[in-house]
Amino acid sequence: MKFFVDTADVKEIRELNDLGLLDGVTTNPSLILKSGRDIVEVTKEICSIVEGPVSAEVTATEYSEMMKEAAALSRIADNICIKLPLTLDGLKACKALTSDGHHTNVTLCFSANQALLAAKAGATFVSPFIGRLDDIAFDGMDLIREIRQIFDNYGYETEILAASIRTVNHVKEAALIGADVVTAPPATLKALVKHPLTDKGLEMFLADWAKTGQKIG
């Protein structure tokens, strides 16, 4: 499974990348706003930190304007992945961009039907939103399961990028079901390492080692 981080915070991206955990980055207009930086400036810096795909989202809603914005975003760096909304215009742009050799991430997916359309449009990634479905009492993992079965049935190469990940359990469940990628906030990715028995065991080992009076090296 690939791990993407969902942030435009360069400090957090550097830290996770140095740990060897990152396969890519996803951003959106809300995260750019939170960063307080110019979209081109911050996206270019992010692309210089990670080798994997960096999703940068268009804000236009009409096909022709989407294509103009996609052209501008793609000039930022070679590892830009154009993020598009799951609308008819977004799918049309996805097809055109994919045919032209660009990587694409079709976002705001909330149904298996939508995911199927994204795959048919040639999307590199489709991003089903887990947490937001949970908010309306729909099990987001059921959606991942449905998409996985459909893609496997027909051999679609579009990767399932589980988004709106809010807990470490979301990560585990997405991995068990077969999502290709999860994108999560920095805090959630860091929390994956935590377990109380790990902390307790380390504390015990260090206490016992101190009693030996020895040093290594």
Curated annotation (Swiss-Prot):
HAMAP family named in the record: Transaldolase_3b
Gene Ontology molecular function: aldehyde-lyase activity; transaldolase activity
Top EC class, one word: transferase
Pathways per UniProt: Carbohydrate degradation; pentose phosphate pathway; D-glyceraldehyde 3-phosphate and beta-D-fructose 6-phosphate from D-ribose 5-phosphate and D-xylulose 5-phosphate (non-oxidative stage): step 2/3
Protein family membership: Belongs to the transaldolase family. Type 3B subfamily.
Residues in the signal sequence: none
PROSITE patterns attached to this UniProt entry: TRANSALDOLASE_1 (PS01054), TRANSALDOLASE_2 (PS00958)
Cell compartments where the protein resides: Cytoplasm
Catalysed reaction equations from the record: D-sedoheptulose 7-phosphate + D-glyceraldehyde 3-phosphate = D-erythrose 4-phosphate + beta-D-fructose 6-phosphate
GO CC, alphabetical: cytoplasm
Active site: 83
Keyword match Cytoplasm: yes
Keyword field: Cytoplasm, Pentose shunt, Schiff base, Transferase
Protein name per Swiss-Prot or TrEMBL: Probable transaldolase
EC number: 2.2.1.2
Principal localisation: cytoplasm
Organism placement in taxonomy: Bacteria, Pseudomonadati, Pseudomonadota, Alphaproteobacteria, Hyphomicrobiales
Function: Transaldolase is important for the balance of metabolites in the pentose-phosphate pathway.
